[in-house]
């Protein structure tokens, strides 16, 4: 636990005094900082014309080389040849003809379609945030409450994010008792678009589609419907040749109209989350306190997508309507943490002793469902019950952690400091005989040279600690069973569903551990105008949790194992200065570090571990 550091989060709490009401808000705009420079319609037509002429020239030169090799006369050709002659010379190679749709642009006609597809999908997106809070209290009761609203449009059309949240904190003190609670509920609504996908699959990525769309095609047809002329086999962009024959298709890259992709598809995610925390504290005596803390984190989300029939089938003659598709996904997470600690603090003639002992329990359960439906008879009802659900899935998993901890700190007049700590963690993810890990740590520091006038503080420190990592799948040690469909017998329709092992168990799996030594010093000079810090560290991680390839005869590809050693060592140095000149303050901070990472051991013979996926 804590092998990658610990983040401490402190929320706003009420202060003693009269009630204070405050408001904070802003309104702003966001835009794409830089668009990609693209050709306009006339430049695009010139480029396509050059490309087709080059293709025609290369094709004819290849044909003539073969004719000469056969002692035959070469064919005469020129880039001014008509499409009919090009087809005759190349035996109907349609890649050599000049698309009819670009001819008006080559002639320089005015007032033709010239679409900037980036301008069509991007926008100046507004965003606003508002927060109202009230806080106050008495010596016995302090409170803080706030209500927040955030609305943010996406820079791509038809995308936005909205969040409603609130926070309530209460602290009550009565004699030797202290009580408090925190509550932070929030609701978010997100309308997303496929901004990162490829232009010709996966629903059509909006940005990629815009960058692949030719500027000679409009966003809308004359009747106001979306133009899908660049969906390669569209009949309204048939190429008519000089002899009257027709080549179906527009000779351009197949791509859906990106504006239609953004506006017609639905991808809405609604989520709610509640962070809650309640604590109680009893001071049995000034030096001895007991504290219990219980926190919860509850998360629920639902995602609904719908792709209407008005987005045509890709690369198909006539732009026929596609079959509508919809998905529904849900996710639930429930996490609770219960902590109990006893602390003792005592000062005796410059000797300060602080001790802590505690016990914690944590549990989390995750659930998810997925359903896919098609066969919708209308685009007006995008819910799954209006179609036919053809596949679905659901998952549930849980994990738990028990921990015991103890810490003792000694301080003598702020000059000598020693800390020792020990924690034991038991994780459900490991085998029943290997769930517990023990993690001790010790540190010491000394402040000296305060007698020198230019030195405000100089502290040397050293520490050693052992931390653990249990971030593996919840059932990584046990192995999982999955359901599969299998064809039995000679009749392919005889599909039988059964269960089979999915992952290879490893009951010997245990904690990955990291032992780290730190040496360093901190200095403050010239009345705290200059501060320095230096850290040297050496970290050894062993029993790494890795997926290791296993022989194929086992029926598995990999097994989770404790294997290998990794060393990290390095240095960090920082220097800062804080200067005040009257009412003017300025500061400078500089930091530099170097880390050396070395894989010391990786299984028998240090063989490489090669795996796919994430």
Q: Which residue stretches match the model-derived regions?
A:
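N-terminal plug
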Residues: 1, 12, 30-35, 508
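Non-catalytic regulatory/gating segments with a bias toward low-complexity or hydrophobic composition
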Residues: 7-9, 573
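Active-site beta-strand termini and strand-to-loop segments that position acidic
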Residues: 11-12, 523
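Flexible loop and strand-edge segments within Gram-negative outer membrane beta-barrel domains
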Residues: 32, 107-148, 152-159, 167-248, ...
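Extracellular/periplasmic, surface-exposed regions of secreted and cell-surface proteins
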Residues: 163, 169-177, 182-187, 243-307, ...
């Amino acid at each position: 636990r804590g092998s990658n550091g610990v983040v401490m989060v402190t929320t706003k709490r009420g202060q003693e005094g009269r009630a204070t009401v405050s408001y904070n808000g802003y309104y702003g705009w966001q835009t794409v900082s830089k668009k990609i420079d693209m050709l306009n319609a006339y430049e695009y037509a010139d480029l396509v014309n050059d490309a087709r002429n080059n293709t025609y020239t290369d094709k004819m030169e290849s044909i003539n080389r073969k004719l000469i090799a056969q002692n035959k006369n070469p064919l005469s050709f020129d880039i001014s040849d008509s499409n009919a002659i090009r087809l005759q010379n190349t035996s109907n190679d349609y890649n050599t003809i000049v698309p009819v749709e670009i001819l008006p642009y080559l002639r320089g006609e005015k007032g033709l379609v010239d679409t900037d597809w980036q301008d069509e999908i991007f926008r100046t997106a507004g965003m606003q945030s508002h927060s109202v809070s009230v806080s106050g209290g008495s010596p016995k009761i302090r409170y803080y409450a706030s209500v927040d609203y955030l609305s943010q449009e996406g820079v791509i059309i038809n995308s936005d994010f909205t969040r409603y949240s609130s926070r309530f904190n209460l602290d009550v003190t009565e004699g030797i008792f202290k009580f408090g609670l925190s509550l932070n509920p929030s609701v978010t609504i997100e309308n997303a678009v496929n901004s990162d996908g490829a232009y010709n699959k996966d629903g059509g990525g909006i940005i990629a589609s815009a960058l692949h769309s030719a500027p000679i095609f409009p966003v809308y047809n004359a009747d106001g419907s979306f133009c899908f002329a660049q969906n390669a086999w569209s009949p309204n962009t048939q190429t008519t040749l000089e002899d009257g024959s027709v080549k179906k298709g527009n000779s351009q890259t197949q791509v859906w109209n990106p504006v239609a992709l953004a506006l017609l598809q639905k991808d809405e995610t609604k989520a709610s989350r509640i962070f809650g925390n309640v604590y109680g504290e009893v001071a049995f005596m000034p030096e001895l306190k007991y504290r219990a803390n219980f926190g919860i984190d509850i998360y629920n989300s639902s995602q609904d997508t719908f792709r209407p029939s008005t987005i045509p089938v890709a690369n198909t003659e006539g732009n026929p309507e596609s079959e509508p598709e919809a998905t529904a996904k849900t996710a639930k997470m429930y996490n609770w943490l219960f902590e109990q600690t006893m602390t003792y603090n005592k000062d005796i003639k410059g000797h300060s002793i602080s001790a802590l002992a505690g016990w914690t329990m944590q549990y989390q359960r995750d659930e998810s469902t997925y359903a896919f439906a098609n066969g919708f008879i209308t685009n007006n009802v995008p819910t799954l019950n209006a179609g036919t659900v053809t596949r679905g899935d659901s998952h549930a998993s849980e994990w738990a952690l028990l921990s015991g901890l103890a810490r003792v700190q000694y301080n003598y007049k702020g000059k000598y400091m020693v800390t020792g700590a020990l924690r034991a963690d038991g994780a459900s993810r490991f085998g029943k005989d290997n769930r517990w890990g023990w993690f001790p740590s010790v540190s010491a520091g000394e402040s000296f040279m305060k007698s020198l006038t230019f030195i405000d503080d100089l502290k040397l420190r050293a520490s050693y600690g052992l931390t653990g990592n249990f971030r593996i799948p919840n059932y990584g040690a046990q192995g999982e069973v999955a359901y599969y469909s299998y064809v039995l017998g000679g009749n392919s329709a005889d599909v039988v569903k059964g269960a089979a092992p999915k992952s290879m168990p490893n009951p010997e799996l245990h904690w990955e551990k990291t032992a780290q030594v730190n040496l360093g010093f901190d200095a403050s000079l010239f009345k705290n105008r200059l501060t320095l810090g230096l850290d040297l560290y050496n970290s050894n991680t062993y029993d790494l949790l890795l997926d290791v390839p296993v022989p194929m005869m086992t029926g598995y590809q990999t097994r989770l194992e404790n294997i290998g050693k990794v060393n990290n060592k390095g240095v960090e140095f920082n220097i800062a200065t804080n200067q005040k000149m009257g009412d003017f303050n300025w500061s400078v901070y500089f930091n530099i570090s170097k880390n050396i990472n070395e894989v010391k051991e990786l299984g028998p013979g240090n063989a490489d571990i090669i795996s796919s996926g994430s």
